[in-house]
UniProtKB/Swiss-Prot annotation:
Name of the protein: Tyrosine phenol-lyase
EC number: 4.1.99.2
Gene Ontology MF annotations: tyrosine phenol-lyase activity
Alphabetized UniProt keyword annotations: Lyase, Pyridoxal phosphate
Catalytic activity: L-tyrosine + H2O = phenol + pyruvate + NH4(+)
Family: Belongs to the beta-eliminating lyase family.
Gene Ontology BP terms: tyrosine metabolic process
Residue numbers of N6-(pyridoxal phosphate)lysine PTMs: K258
Top-level taxonomy: Bacteria, Pseudomonadati, Pseudomonadota, Gammaproteobacteria, Pasteurellales
Alphabetized CDD domains for the sequence: Tnase_like (cd00617)
Length: 458
């Protein structure tokens, strides 16, 4: 029996939410083209679309907003952010950006040349889009077990080092500017990478002159899982684990909207002097001065404070416990989920939930729509729609994992809210055979999952 600790915080301000009727939700979903991204927030009762920018800030962070230095250059809030990033992550240089994909854009532009290959432990939507936009081909080198939702391994985000070596042998190290190592791996179910695997990857890459760049968006969750699952670190602090993790990277991209506990912001970290200079030149073009990167001073201050709060053990323990709580309720009712449970979300296995719907009829997309209609809960498709099309052939990527992500915002919802989510999904699971597939009636050229529209099969 797991322990689900009480919230390690008090509620100081509230935002009212209201349940709609089923009739209303059916109309809202039809208007949204069966795409949960196209729902209005006021139409949603419990919003588990994403944990990106949806977390609750602390009183200290709100206080930090009041001491924003909005100087165009040399903001003292940037200096604070830079000091905190160096203390907790250990990188030499910090370039702020408006959010994570701003950092991805900088990294891809300064490091990739046409014809390159970027290996990584499973793709992520915006990350791969930036890599491909700059002429690279993404190569998945995650362990095979990550593609099976039912295999329960403590570190399913690990890189298969043999796959990495094989790629180096086939294309040459000069064609691999860096490895993109996600800690944790979102599309595998929030799966962590072990410290031992990071160490091994870094050693191999250093041998061949290949840089290691972390997608550090949920690095604190990864640090918690190392403490929980890697015996060597059971007595280590989250802060110390995090610092050691980052020592095996040459830099990272960060969406501050996740583990930095803010509503907007991100940054690129780099140790290399020349790459830093290139990033500073480009950030002026895309984002703003290197000392603000498209952010207000107040937002950099809130992010600096959020980084210090994120490594508090009681905070991160409760965060992960909320995921465990929801997962345990669903699993007890026979609902198929990805195992083991990650740190930011519970992922439903849509192929097993709706085995009668072929992947080409978008089962995860329809499941997310039906969860909303059933109980006003917004979730996100993470399957064939998110995977997009092959840039050369135009054919749909067909990932082995066809998932619906129930993403829990930080410090926002209580266990009672999660009870409603579980009850909604369990009720839907009981009449899952009545659910039909979808046709895609509008498909944008880029990142289609954001704005594509669908209609139910007749």
């Amino acid at each position: 029996m797991r322990n689900y600790p009480a919230e390690p915080y008090k509620v100081k301000a509230v935002e009212p939410i209201a349940m709609t009727t089923r009739e209303q939700r059916e109309a809202y979903m039809k208007k949204a083209g069966y795409n949960t991204f196209l729902l209005n927030s006021e139409e949603v009762y419990i919003d588990l679309l994403t944990d990106s920018g949806t977390s609750a800030m602390s009183d200290k962070q709100w206080a930090g907003l009041m001491i924003g230095d909005e100087a165009y250059a040399g903001s003292r809030n940037f200096m604070h952010l830079q000091d905190v990033v160096r203390e907790y992550y250990g990188f030499k240089y910090v370039v702020p950006t408006h959010q994570g994909r701003g950092a991805e854009n900088l990294l891809s532009t300064i490091m990739i040349k046409p014809g390159d290959y970027v290996p990584g432990n499973m793709y992520f939507t915006t990350t791969r889009a930036h890599q491909e936009r700059n002429g690279a081909t993404f190569v998945d080198i995650i362990i095979d077990e990550a593609h099976d939702s039912q295999i329960d391994l403590p570190f399913k985000g690990n890189v298969d080092v043999k796959k990495l070596q094989k790629l180096i042998d086939e294309v040459g190290a000069d064609k691999i500017p860096y490895i993109c190592l996600a800690v944790t791996v979102n599309l595998a179910g929030g799966q962590p990478v072990s410290m031992a695997n990071m160490r091994e990857v870094k050693a191999l890459c250093s041998k061949h002159g290949i840089k290691v760049m972390f997608d550090a968006t949920r690095c604190v969750e990864n640090a918690y899982f190392i403490k929980e699952r890697e015996a060597e670190y059971k007595d280590a602090t989250i802060k110390d684990i995090l610092k050691e993790m980052m020592s095996y990277a040459d830099g990272c991209t960060m969406s501050g909207k996740k583990d930095c506990l803010v509503n907007i912001g991100g940054f690129l970290c780099i140790n290399d002097d020349d790459l830093y200079q290139q990033a500073c030149e480009l950030v002026v073009l895309f984002e703003g001065m290197p000392s603000y990167g498209g952010l207000a001073g107040r937002d950099m201050e809130a992010m600096a404070i959020g980084i210090t709060e994120s490594v508090d053990f009681h905070y991160i323990q409760h965060r992960v416990a909320q995921c465990y709580y929801l997962a345990d309720k669903l699993e007890a009712a026979g609902v198929p989920i990805v195992k083991p449970v990650g740190g930011h979300a519970v992922f439903l296995d849509a192929k097993k939930f709706l085995p009668h719907i072929p992947q080409e009829q978008f089962p995860a997309q329809m499941l997310a729509a039906q969860i909303y209609i059933e109980g006003g809960v917004r979730s996100m498709e993470r399957g064939i729609v998110s995977a997009g099309r092959d840039k050369k052939t135009g054919a749909n990527h067909t990932p082995k994992l066809e998932l619906v992500r129930l993403t829990i915002p930080r410090r926002v919802y209580t266990y009672a809210h999660l009870d409603h989510v579980a009850d909604t999904i369990i009720k839907l699971f009981k009449h899952r055979d009545d659910i039909k597939g979808l046709d895609m009636v509008y498909e944008p050229k880029l990142l289609r999952f954001f704005t594509a529209r669908f209609e139910p099969k007749a």
